[in-house]
């Protein structure tokens, strides 16, 4: 069940890997899609973790066990070959615990907590996930209006914390898809396809414009919203493809 998860995860891995190939491709602009791939991963986290049945300590401990051992292996290797350096206890805490050298881990470990709280509240109150999405959007826009430096384009810089709003929103969209999965039909419609290409074009055109035209940096708040919508649009196509049996037939051919 949910074979689309594996295919969507593969797409995310390809996009993220490709984003690190700026020095390999003939043109650095070809190394795109990293943030798109990150948001897909967060979408999948929200989708797969929808059913919360454990107490928070047990649930969070399971997340730690799934995330940190791989990090520790990588950290030990990188420190051993001196690709990384650590001087003092705080440097080792940075490498092995938080925030680590990988923005994804520091973000996901914080957002797991927020996601758990939201799901618990939702289960007890029956409030639609859409309202939580709207609340996240409202907080994001409010903080952007008063706290964000609008003089330069940096809204999706993984070195800053602004990207966590779209990561959290992607998780909630994933949870919403899990909640509504059985209601999604198998027919891929023209609006589904057109919507995907329009959002993809808007997203990449927006990134190019913000990167090259300094005067439009004040409108950068729109880009993360388009990004989350694009992830949702992508998921619609993948879920419907799964329900049409596309992935099952493809897997059979591969085997």
Stretch-by-stretch model annotation:
Residues 4, 11, 167, 177-184, ...:
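Residue-level recognition of alpha-helix termini/interfacial anchor residues
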Residues 65-69, 106, 110, 163, ...:
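Transmembrane alpha-helices of multi-pass, membrane-embedded glycan-processing enzymes
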Residues 35, 80, 84, 91, ...:
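Alpha-helical transmembrane segments of multi-pass integral membrane proteins
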Residues 28-31, 127-130, 163-164, 215-223:
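Short, aromatic-rich membrane-interface segments at the entry and exit
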Residues 132-180:
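Loop-centered beta-sheet repeat module
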Residues 1-152, 184-197, 240, 244-250:
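Membrane-cytosol interface segments of multi-pass membrane proteins
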